[in-house]
Amino acid sequence: MPKKKTGPRKKAENRREREKQLRASRSTVDLAKHPCNASMECDKCQRRQKNRAFCYFCNSVQKLPICAQCGKTKCMMKSSDCVIKHAGVYSTGLAMVGAICDFCEAWVCHGRKCLSTHACACPLTDAECVECERGVWDHGGRIFSCSFCHNFLCEDDQFEHQASCQVLEAETFKCVSCNRLGQHSCLRCKACFCDEHTRSKVFKQEKGKQPPCPKCGHETQETKDLSMSTRSLKFGRQTGGEEGDGASGYDAYWKNLSSDEYADTGYHDDEEEDEAEDEEEEEDGKDSDAESSDLFTSLNLGRTYASGYAHYEEQEN
């Protein structure tokens, strides 16, 4: 029989469980609500952007910097572990800051805990948009996380990416390793796996969570809970239209190709006919101009300036 747990042992186990849950809840904080990714409006140019030490657009320093770790704008003397001791009861502005994070480009206050823990726990350490491959230093907007594949996204690509994220890189919902129906889907690899092939020796399944992807280790989701769609690639004989009985094959494919070729030759024939008509119209126009000039040459208008006659010649005669 197992040993009976004593009071101190129960308290220690409960404390360890609470600490574990606290660490897990801290790691699952919404990225949009994190202080280093908070929304900030510049005091000088009035442009909204991600919380950062210097404005992305005008490089000006904010009057009230926000700490990237604890999110405070005022450092109190009594209730904080200040590395830099300040004389007053509290400090704000540049007197409160202690460092700039290299990952999120935001101020960190001069508290000992924030300075020692933020660089290791910064959620924007590898924050590079999966679509445009821009980091925090390459654009001024905030960083978001895809709700399906949990990759980083910038403000410009977040809606477009999430609208097309649930698309498999296959034409069926079958498992990539066998021919059975894939009950679990990895939204990073865009592939489905059956129950047997989700068991991996490399990535272990945690208690109370979905099995990890055998390729990348990301947590899979059940396909029935997602609005997954397959990618349709039409090439070769698949581009041919279906026949009356619903079948399509190479006959329809070659018929379409031949009809396209005939359509192209007909198009070129029409162009040649139009050019010939234009040339005929130009020739007809030249003939009509010559005929009209012949008619006017037979007319006698007498002595005019156009015929080389001037009025002073008549006076001399």
Curated annotation (Swiss-Prot):
Entry superkingdom: Eukaryota
One Pfam entry name: NOA36
GO CC annotation terms, alphabetical: chromosome, centromeric region; nucleolus
Compositionally biased region (Acidic residues): 269-292
UniProt KW Phosphoprotein keyword: yes
Family: Belongs to the NOA36 family.
Protein name as it appears in the record: Zinc finger protein 330
Species for this entry: Cricetulus griseus (Chinese hamster)
